[in-house]
């Protein structure tokens, strides 16, 4: 009886650990798919990030408040970066 109970509990624990690991792996793979844009899109994103941060830095150096450059196409300037809205 004890052996059967131990075997059942061991199998249940292994199943829980396996399921949890599988869910984490699936979530990570979905994040990787979503977070990996095409190279063309990445270049556009980097360009927008660069334009926005340079604009803010120039204005800060002139002892003015940073009036963030308006980002177009569903983007906005936040923390000196263009972010997707």
Curated annotation (Swiss-Prot):
Propeptide positions: 23-48
For this chain, the annotated S-S bridges are: 52-66, 56-77, 71-82
For whether the record's keyword set contains Signal, the answer is yes
Reported tissue expression: Expressed by the venom gland.
Keywords, sorted A to Z = Disulfide bond, Neurotoxin, Postsynaptic neurotoxin, Secreted, Signal, Toxin
The residue range of the signal peptide is 1-22
Q: Name one GO molecular function term.
A: toxin activity
Tell me any Pfam family this protein matches. Answer: Toxin_20
Q: Where in the cell is it found?
A: Secreted
This protein's record includes keyword Magnesium: no
**PROSITE patterns in alphabetical order:** HWTX_2
Cellular component (GO) terms are: extracellular region; host cell postsynaptic membrane
Q: Which family does it belong to?
A: Belongs to the neurotoxin 12 (Hwtx-2) family. 02 (Hwtx-2) subfamily.
The record describes its quaternary structure and partners as: Monomer.
What does this protein do, in the record's words?
Answer: Neurotoxin active on both insects and mammals.
Q: What is this protein called?
A: U4-theraphotoxin-Hhn1a
């Amino acid at each position: 009886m004890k052996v059967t109970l131990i075997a059942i509990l061991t199998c249940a624990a292994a199943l829980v650990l396996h399921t949890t690991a599988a869910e984490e792996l699936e979530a990570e793979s979905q994040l990787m798919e979503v977070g990996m844009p095409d190279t063309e899109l990445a270049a556009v994103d980097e360009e927008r990030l660069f334009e926005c941060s340079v604009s803010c830095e120039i204005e800060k150096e002139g002892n003015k408040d940073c009036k963030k450059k308006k980002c177009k196409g569903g983007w906005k300037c936040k923390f000196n970066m263009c972010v997707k809205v």
